[in-house]
């Protein structure tokens, strides 16, 4: 038996595929690999696969990970090519390899963030946003698992921010906590609306670039 991990890109139209539909897409694709995927027990067995740190709908990523098990011994070579033969536009498997690192080692994520302004970027926006996201405390309202609103200080979850001022957008890179607890970079827009409403963007784009361990090394 082998535990394997896929590295894949999710972008363009595929960024709007829900988590459940993404799982179904891979479940339909696995027969092309000719691997014997480990299945659940019961009346309706299905392939046991899990996506590491599922991506919020509407965001794109260069570093999505999916874990699964097969009954035979394999190192995963050649699997990516077989899966890509029938993947929908915007999904592309880059690699398949043994899943040696536990998911608990995943600590941070690096993402590109673009805050777009239809009428041009307000003066001093990049500097003001940098100051906002480096505050010692930054409280926003966030929905809990019970769907209630609660005040949450997201400042401890923000590790790095770098922003540049453009004509119609502020672009930058952020490193935020990935889990226990994790911070969805989309919530940065909510923090802007709450604390610097004049700088609230008209649209926000997020692209996840890398998953990192606690030492800042790339997690695979």
Residues covered by each model-derived region:
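Extended, well-folded interaction surfaces typified by the phenylalanyl-tRNA synthetase beta subunit core
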Residues: 2, 7-9, 13, 17, ...
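Short, charge-patterned binding micro-sites
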Residues: 37-70, 100-102
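Ordered, amphipathic secondary-structure segments that act as subunit-interaction surfaces
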Residues: 62-114
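Short amphipathic alpha-helices in soluble, non-transmembrane regions
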Residues: 78-87, 123-135, 188-189
